[in-house]
Amino acid sequence: MNEQSEPITMWFDRRLVLRKSPIQGIGTFATHEIAAGELLILVTGGIVYTTEDWQTGKVQLEAELYNEANIAKDLCIATPKSFHYYVNHSCDPNAVDLSRSGRATQYVADRAIRTGEEITADYYDETTLKQCNCQSPKCRWVK
């Protein structure tokens, strides 16, 4: 591992649970009402490695267990999959990721969230999002 690896800190609002999602696979859901502006998820740090580390086998991570992101040219960070990984996309989201770098994930409620509602964020990108299943009347994929 790279000397730039950082301690992993994960914090999740206790009113969140993982459940089967009608949008895709597993989703993060609210068990109680959550007010706009409340912090939902905060993840910092991770296993930092270079693409060379990966290619030469110095780093071996099980893809099913880790969420990976590029943080610079030829530099990646991995964190264990948890609530942050299961925030599904919606064209009409109720949460926003305030992170400004790949070294942190910080989801905040963008509006009031009802009990039982799935936590969603808009990470629309034509190059990575091949299909949208958000089922929102505001869906940008519906023609």
Language-model segments: residues:
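C-terminal SET catalytic tail plus cysteine-rich post-SET Zn-binding segment of SAM-dependent SET-domain
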Residues: C91-K143
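Catalytic cores of histone-lysine modification enzymes
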Residues: N2-V96
